[in-house]
């Protein structure tokens, strides 16, 4: 063997080991960059020395020419289906049949239990350790030749990881697409105006049956082995579980959830455990496969028709069903998001009766090409809200009606706007819309907004539920009699709440802007808006170009602000707030280049009386300062409010400049 051949063999062996660690053990020993480096090194050597290229090289997963069609492969050992059980009673009957048939009955019966993967069954033949042929299950006797496509699946070894491979070994398993890969695939398809897949199983099937293996290579497919067909030149373990572990040891991936269970009760416990974990597995399963573990007992039990007597699929309740779309209603969420909800002919899916399903947004309606009256496929997985995943367009009736997305909010009649680049359309009546009322009011009274002590979430809930308030302005119209009629609201608590409301009328423009709850407008942005426009009227009248002159206000935020002020309902509520006495003094802040704090480290301590701590922090950051939470020798200034404690003492000890709140305000305002 030449030095080049030795180098090639060593590279291939190393890369196969890394692939095994990554795809089978899920425990890579090297970073991806090291694998990539060796892979490219191998590829370059093979290009220089094509006479030494082998079909089982890690570089040869992709590269076959597109096929004109699939040839047929006859299975030497038929790929049988399984009988199904749909209840504990049916499973127990299966166990009873086994017990009645066995001459010497072991106590207890041991089962190898596996999740039933929702993918496609395949057969992969290795000759002297090299992947030689792969086929679909087909009708059990004959399948399609998918060798070129199977070679592209990253966790399928092209050569078995053993120095003593069997002469012939047929691995049987399921090819599927994990949820994460499925979502990436559909996202890419949407971005490139390509057809999307209804579910991961369809995506896996479509990918495996691609005539062009280069396309299959870009699909995130995975194999999990579940058994062995042909085995020549090897002494196999005597139990099903040990055979799967042996497959894993030679590089074939198996499912990590496989478990040995003794007796029917343990098996049923496994079934329920997997059912509970179903939504968090990261891939689709539709039940469990339960097999007698002892191979000798399997052989004794034998087969009936097209199924083994020693195994059964205990299926979960169906997750997908067909039903009719009777109507579509548009709901308004607490943040103003408009969600189309399908009203369905009730249908039993995954253990519950489903009559509603989400349609997500306008894009989804368009993608599905769905109309009222259509026959639709409903899917319910775990605790996930039922959704429509497909439409049987060939069943569309002549009287089907198109779904029209509303232009005005179905709750408050405010305009509905969809910002470019966003999937969700929203009601613009944030201060007025009843659907958004509770959240808008809770935000309005919060500490960082109007800071109304004594008026918390529970009180807001009561006031809204009893229809005593509808907008933030109504808070300032409350009286003692109204409040004392509420649950857990005595005279003292009511007086405190009213005093807090009265005190809150004196605020700052920045706090007021933040309290309005304009989407994407946080504390710092509100402060920037107040400093830039100086008055509420100037902000209200600003156009998009003027809004984008404000620091940290880009196109999206500018759109949010502009749309808010163009909705008449919002303007009416703001005017009502001013009429109720909400006011502020104009405080004009110096530009960053003119102030003392640019590029300085500042610590805030104690209670500030004229603004909140976060407001002061945002203001300092706007002026170019770094705000720290602790005092050190690197601190330039400490701003001390009332009841300043250890930070003030440490600043004095380190001879750091200390400013009172009044001195701080004098430094930053003109």
From Swiss-Prot:
GO terms for molecular function: DNA binding; DNA ligase (NAD+) activity; metal ion binding. Transmembrane segments: none annotated. GO terms for cellular component: cytosol. The keyword Cell division does not apply. It catalyses: NAD(+) + (deoxyribonucleotide)n-3'-hydroxyl + 5'-phospho-(deoxyribonucleotide)m = (deoxyribonucleotide)n+m + AMP + beta-nicotinamide D-nucleotide. Keywords: DNA damage, DNA repair, DNA replication, Ligase, Magnesium, Manganese, Metal-binding, NAD, Zinc. The active site is at residue 116. Disulfide bonds: none annotated. Residues 592-670 form the BRCT domain. Its cofactor is Mg(2+); Mn(2+). The keyword Ligase applies. Zn(2+) binds at residues 409, 412, 427, 433. CDD domains: BRCT_DNA_ligase_like (cd17748), LIGANc (cd00114). Signal peptide: none annotated. PROSITE patterns: BRCT, DNA_LIGASE_N1, DNA_LIGASE_N2. Its EC number is 6.5.1.2. GO terms for biological process: DNA repair; DNA replication. InterPro entries: BRCT_dom, BRCT_dom_sf, DisA/LigA_HHH, DNA_ligase, DNA_ligase_AS, DNA_ligase_CS, DNAligase_adenylation, DNAligase_N. NAD(+) binds at residues 32-36, 81-82, 114, 137, 174, 291, 315. Belongs to the NAD-dependent DNA ligase family. LigA subfamily. HAMAP family: DNA_ligase_A. DNA ligase that catalyzes the formation of phosphodiester linkages between 5'-phosphoryl and 3'-hydroxyl groups in double-stranded DNA using NAD as a coenzyme and as the energy source for the reaction. It is essential for DNA replication and repair of damaged DNA. This is DNA ligase. It comes from Haemophilus influenzae (strain PittGG). The gene is ligA.
